[in-house]
């Protein structure tokens, strides 16, 4: 059990670093590099399917059942979906990424025993976009 926990912690730390790179590239206006990091993020989790094309319920089932991801990993995917929305052109695809991100974050927030200010801020920001 210790080896599995250690692997999971290292994977979460690596994914967290990738998310920071995505944010940094997006803020610098380096959209191509940010999109490359997003693809790398999904590759690290062995997600070959296009999550952008999935319906919300289908996405959740895919992440939980098919990929057997935990809430921490799902939360990171929600953060990446939000960034994909930020990088998308204004329109329906932007809102679709934001909807998926909000839905996943809301699910994690409901099920989590830990309060996360970062999660609450992301939920509030997404709610602003969606209203």
Q: Language-model features: where?
A:
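N-terminal alpha-helical interaction modules that lie
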Residues: 1-71, 102-107, 125-131
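TPR repeat positional signature
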Residues: 11, 18, 74, 78-81, ...
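Short coil/turn connectors between adjacent alpha-helices in alpha-solenoid helical repeat scaffolds
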Residues: 25-32, 85-97
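Mid-chain, well-packed structural core segment of small domains
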Residues: 68-93
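Amphipathic alpha-helical binding modules
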Residues: 90-131
